[in-house]
Every structure is written in C-alpha cells, then in structure tokens.
Regions:
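A charged, aromatic-enriched C-terminal amphipathic alpha-helix characteristic of glycosyltransferases
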Residues: 255-286
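Nucleotide-sugar-dependent
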Residues: 130, 176-181, 188-210, 217-229
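Conserved acidic donor-binding segment of nucleotide-sugar-dependent glycosyltransferases
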Residues: 233-241, 249-255
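C-terminal alpha-helical cap of glycosyltransferases
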Residues: 274-305
C-alpha cells in the first residue's frame, strides 16, 4: 500500500495536502512530506464495535501532526476541541438537488413497489448503532405499517435481526438509488440505539430526508435534537411507543407536502450545502498553506476509510 501511495503522489505537483478520515491510514502515509495535514473526523471510531486497540494511539499521533481538524457535528467538536488548537465544527451538509428528486413521484423499484402504505423507511448501515429491538416493537405494534430497511447488515447476526411480515430488508443501494427509495416512503426513520457508538454521531440522513420532503422520526441523538429538534418536521422519540406516536403525527404531515413544516425545513437546508462547507474548509486550509486554494487546488491525497 505504501509503494502504491508513493507512486500515486509522485505524479502530482506540490504542495501536497494529506486528508485523513481515519487514523488507521497513518502507518503507510505518515512518511509523506505534506504541506498541510487535515484530520476530518466524521465519527468517534474508537467507540465502534470491534475497533482496533491501537486506534486511540494512532488518533493521538494524527492530532499531534494535523494542521487543522474538522469535526462532523457539534458533539464530536466538543470531544476534540480541547485536543487541538485549530479544530472546527462542520454539521452535516446535504446535496439538495440530488435528494429533492424524492419530492417527485418516481417509478418504484421492484423490491419496494408492491409494499403497502404507509411506508416508513430507513437507509444506512444496519449495525450496532441501529436499535433492532425498537424496530421489532414498532413492527409488532403496527402490523399495518410497512417498514423498509435499505442498507447492508454489519456486525449483527442474521438470527438477531427482527423478522416480521411487515419488515422488509432490501439490502444495500447506491447513492444514486437513494432518492428513488425515499420518494416511495411516507415517513423517514432514524431508530438509533443510545449507546457508546452513537454518542457522537451527527447523521447526514437528517438533512437528506428533509431535502427529500419527508418528515423525520428519530431517537434522541444529541446532535439531531439540538440541530433539528426545533423543526416541526423532525420528531424525537424515546421508546417504541413514543416512536409510533411520533410516526402517526409525521404521517399526518406527509399528507401535506406543501405545509409549513417543509418550508421551515427548507429554510434550514438552504444554508447547509456541500458547496458552502467546501468553501469554508478550503479557506481554513489556505490559511495553513499561506496561499489561496479555492480556485486551483493543490495535489490532494485523500487517506480515506
């Protein structure tokens, strides 16, 4: 991997910016002579199930060498800001043009087309962050609702997944397909468990679901509550009964797609574009480099997950 990386970097002009999403990339990239080192912390990876034991040591090394730190949400910023003098908070952004396609009536994919309404959906990785017991209880309480689960199942045994006639696992889908599935839902769900692995998350699903014109029902994830909890179209639930109650209110909103709840959400989304985020990040990196990279970027190495 190191030889491949060196060969790749050798073809680019300087300056070189190394951009890390995870400290696990350090062992084969720490030798690079970078003009700027960016640590883009999107999750508290050490809290995830099966996290490598040496992850925390590598993260400290990355924090020591980084010139600037970006954090994906307020909770993560609070966890990192005292560990680096140049840390900045970037709440979830959204590609409104892409996800707003879901506001139109789109031809439905075969694995969703025949599912009865109301449809309540989730997309994303189904792992230890997902509250499978919550899903099981909701499906039992409302057998007339269809629960559509889009995404790969990871770190959860097949036999532990809740199974019911109204729970539908349709597997992982591409980014391009997500608005199509979203368009066929009545309510979008974020039934996250409240545990170590969700303590610092700031789900990008929240603005994506809203951009798709769907009311959202979520567990009480800290960054969701404080960033979106005041919106009429975002409902916060604390248990299965609360989830069902919130979903009933959200279903009423879904029947009024031009209601005040969506106009209110759109106002928030208007300031949440990835272009705005990119421009702000580029400005902070420019300060490190001492040159403007907003128009012509330097050689960028993305040391990704």
């Amino acid at each position: 991997m190191k030889r491949l990386l060196d060969a790749h970097v050798s073809i680019y002009a300087r300056p070189l910016v190394t951009w890390y999403y995870t400290p696990m990339m350090l062992p084969f990239s720490r030798h690079l002579d970078a003009s700027a080192v960016v640590y883009d912390a999107m999750d508290e990876l050490s809290k995830f199930k099966f996290a490598p034991e040496h992850l925390l040591d590598l993260e400290q090394e990355l924090l020591d060498s980084a010139d600037v730190v970006f954090t994906g949400g307020a909770s993560l910023y609070e966890a990192k800001k005292d560990r680096h003098t140049n840390a900045h908070c970037f709440p979830s952004s959204v590609d409104r043009k892409h996800f707003s396609k879901a506001r139109r009536e789109l031809p439905q994919p075969a694995d969703q087309a025949d599912l009865k309404h109301p449809r309540l959906g989730f997309y994303g990785v189904i792992d230890e962050r997902f509250d499978i017991d919550m899903l099981r209880q909701m499906a039992d309480m409302r057998p007339d609702w269809s629960f559509v689960m889009v995404g790969p199942v990871v770190k959860i045994a097949e036999e532990d997944l809740p199974r019911a006639a109204n729970i539908h696992y349709v597997g992982g889908k591409t980014y391009e397909q997500l608005p199509v599935y979203l368009s066929g839902w009545d309510v979008a769900l974020m039934p996250f468990a409240l545990n170590e692995s969700t303590q610092f998350i700031s789900p990008t699903k929240t603005p994506e679901y809203l951009a798709g014109g769907k009311p959202v029902v979520s567990s009480a994830i800290k960054d969701v509550v404080r960033t979106y909890g005041h919106l009429q179209g975002v409902h916060i639930a604390h248990d299965a009964e609360g989830f069902v109650h919130c979903c009933e209110k959200a279903l009423e909103q879904s029947r009024d797609p031009n209601g005040d709840w969506l106009a209110e959400a759109d106002l928030i989304l208007s300031a949440s574009s990835w272009d705005t985020t990119q421009a702000r990040m580029a400005g902070l990196i420019s300060q490190v480099l001492g040159e403007d990279i907003s128009q012509e970027a330097p050689a960028l190495l993305v040391a990704a997950e």
